[in-house]
Amino acid sequence: MEQYTVTGMSCAACSTRVEKAVSKVPGVTSCSVSLLTNSMGVEGTASEQDIVKAVTDAGYGASKKGSKAAENTKNGSSAAGSSFGDEELLKDRETPVLKKRLLSSLVFLIVLMYFSMGHMMWGWPLPAVLADNHIAMGLIQMLLTIAVMVINQKFFISGFKSLFHKAPNMDTLVALGSAAAFVYSTYALFAMTDAQVHGNMDGVMHYMHEFYFESAAMILTLITVGKMLEAHSKGKTTDALKGLMKLAPKTAVLVKDGVETEVSIEQVQKGDIFIVRPGENIPVDGKVLEGSSAVNESALTGESIPVDKAAGDLVSAATINQSGYLKCEATRVGEDTVLSQIIQMVSDAAATKAPIAKVADKVSGIFVPAVITIAAVTIIVWLLAGQSVGFALARGISVLVISCPCALGLATPVAIMVGNGMGAKNGILFKTAVSLEEAGKIEIVALDKTGTITTGEPKVTDVICNKGVTEKELISFAYALEKKSEHPLAKAVLAYAEAAQTDIFEVNNFTALPGNGLTAEYENAVLSGGNYKFISTRTAVSQEMQEQSQKLANAGKTPLFFTKDDKLLGIIAVADVIKEDSPEAVRQLQNMGIRVVMLTGDNERTAKAIGAQAGVDEVIADVLPDGKDSVISRLKRDGRVAMVGDGINDAPALTRADIGIAIGAGTDIAIDAADIVLMKSRLSDVPAAIRLSRATLRNIHENLFWAFFYNIIGIPLAAGVWIPFFGWKLNPMFGAAAMSLSSFCVVTNALRLNLFSVHNAEKDKKIKSKKKVEDKKMEKTLTIEGMMCGHCEARVKKALEALPEVKEAVVSHEAGTAVVTLESAVSDEALKEAVEAQDYKVISVQ
């Protein structure tokens, strides 16, 4: 996605206009404009010149972001913070300008209000020269109003320019309202002068009360107040993104030929050697060559506990070296660093639009023309009803200035920006606004077992010694054997032995028998290690040890037997243990009304043991890597599905799911395929992400309700609909004040999300979700591998429906499933045999 900065936008109608203009450019596949950040994201093959021209022709300005940074990268020098240049773009320049305009306007407005209303309402004294000099009073009011209009000329330039381009915006409404009040007041001044010349005092008094100079000036000043408050609040919504950008180090200390040199971060290249002293920020992503330290990674992950780093470990830019001296090699620089990628994700998400925003966009596109029409009709109706021009004009002006398309346009993006920032602070990255909105609607969460529910690193859980054997002896011999093994479980045994500081000795004639075990010799004794099947051929295993082994296996652990000659030394159990927060995370998901399913390639016994520990609702075992995609397709029939995984083999399933969630410590492929990335690799962040999504969506609904409600109530009141019934009428000045506050209220409400605690489960509510198909409905779903076309579907359907118990079979080669409706009970084995007789493989039957 290419990012552009757009200038000249003032409301939702502007962003809609720009979006439509760019979307029509040949080669543009998608375009999303953010009024909040004055940015535009464009995808496609269209050239930069064509895109900028389309924006310019629409009456606005545009320039591509980061073009300098891109050039630097091309030349080989790369800025670790090329993305960080956007920090300047996010700087709040609008508030100081508006503040200056407001103060200048107030100086003239206060004087204007003194002359126009002070002496009439509160009896304030006037200079003797102005006493009963109505023409001079009118001229002073006109001149003071002109001063305020000149100060706020931006409304008129932008408003009438947009009207000229047939794309009226909020500035158009303000400009028309203020200009109408000024023009009519000027007419009244000349009419009053004419009456004065002809000695018509009744006419003089009549036209004097038709002055709306103070309304014209007050409208501009109050709208400026609202714009300033809105700009200040909007600036706060990007605090999280600006905070990330500020983390980027500005310099690095490089080492070359033993000489240390401090250079700017833009000069650091991949492969450079740099050093980091205690208390310093790590400048770029790298690999530790020398030294050890505790590194605070809270800036990236939100995890406050420092992580120990030593030679061979990876470090990331913007993390803090807390204790030791580190010498590192730069592995990722510029836009490739983890920090840059996080910033890019958050920035891209802000540049995309949530589906719910489309409603407001459609309304905003016709809102301003509709308001202008309503204002014109209001004036005509009141004139036809016999009211004066001044009265009718006041009602029309009130309609123009009370209407607020900005509140509609800001309702969604401000909440998305704040929600996204809150996620980034907590190590939860939403790639798009769509993922932030849709995550809260999830009904089923499918969890990969390894690395998601479990740590992904096997550990020794039990050490059971045979009679007459000490634990030290068992561990020492096991260590000697496993030291030369490349089996994944060997690492767990080695780590346990090293932690126990066991005796270390070397073995000879080491042999690894794939699928069976290990053998070696030590001081004329033969050492063996492996599974029960292998060891039982070498020595007798007592009933007690067999029962212990069975018990361990039932708990999802892998029992490893070790012998010395024909004597059994004992059993060491190894398991991929579940993460500490997994059971609580699963419980929280269930409390939110979400069904939790665990997917794994492990055998059913091991899978069910892990599933029971985690507390999941359903376990689907023996799923081959390419079978997860089919399982997700089946689950999607029961509701919206989120897939959580970390491996390469999870990527297809992450893409297939409604929402893909990647555990941050996983592979780049899984992260690329996901919609949400969890930086902390903590399962408890899954309910946190869903919780944040729901809170953001709730905030958007509140904002949209306020924006629609405000206009539905405000416009009829301004038009004078209630005057015949209750006598309620709205002065244009109060209409302008209401308009000013409406956008401010929407932005302020969105800022409340900053107070939201993503890990607080106390207020979780269950969603209404589709219920899982129960067994009593006599349906079973087969996940089938090998079907390629409609012919395959027909063969499987015919084979299944040939069974007397099967009423109907619905087969899909795309989903890789067959759903059978049964007349009576039938075994899973019978269904499996019927399909596999046609040369297809049944992965699972549910």
Language-model-detected regions and their locations in the chain:
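Flexible metal-binding regulatory segments at protein termini and peripheral loops
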Residues: 1-136, 161, 259-260, 344-352, ...
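Juxtamembrane coupling segments of multi-pass membrane pumps/enzymes
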Residues: 75, 195-196, 201-202, 217-278, ...
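Membrane-embedded alpha-helical bundles of multi-pass transporters
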Residues: 121-135, 164, 183, 422, ...
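Conserved ATP-binding TGD loop and adjacent catalytic N/P-domain core of P-type ATPases
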Residues: 16, 29, 442, 522-524, ...
